[in-house]
């Protein structure tokens, strides 16, 4: 296993771009997984107990989100010696839903795309 870590310049460009555009953004560790239903329906999986225990551990450690792509991109970027980071759109929050809190689904990618474009512009200039 190899640690999947974003390039700090990419992270900073994304943060600065979000701020400049007035877009709410969070920075931190995310969990990359290879099984969508392993997170959303762990009870149907053969190792459901293990998946649930791991998710609880990630939450306790302050994990911001769970997704399925960034670790591979970050590791390939490290191998190729290119700068890589990630900008996510949170579609829904299963923890809010489980707690009975409002959990609106958001599918509008416009803000995330604008943040990414502005960040790339910053990175090109540096």
What spans do the regions from the language model cover?
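Glycine-rich phosphate- or other oxyanion-binding loops that anchor nucleotides, phosphorylated ligands
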Residues: 1-126
């Amino acid at each position: 296993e190899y640690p999947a870590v974003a390039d700090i310049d990419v992270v900073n460009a994304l943060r600065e771009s979000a701020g400049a555009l007035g877009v709410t953004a969070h920075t931190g560790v995310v969990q990359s997984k290879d099984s969508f239903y392993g997170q959303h329906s762990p009870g149907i999986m053969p190792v459901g107990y293990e998946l649930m225990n791991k998710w609880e551990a990630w939450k306790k450690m302050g994990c911001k989100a769970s997704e399925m792509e960034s670790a591979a991109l970050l590791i390939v970027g490290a191998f190729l010696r290119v700068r890589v980071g990630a900008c996510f759109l949170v579609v829904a929050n299963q923890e809010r839903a489980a707690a009975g809190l409002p959990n609106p689904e958001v599918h509008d990618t416009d803000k995330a795309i604008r943040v990414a474009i502005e960040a790339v512009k910053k990175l090109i200039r540096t």
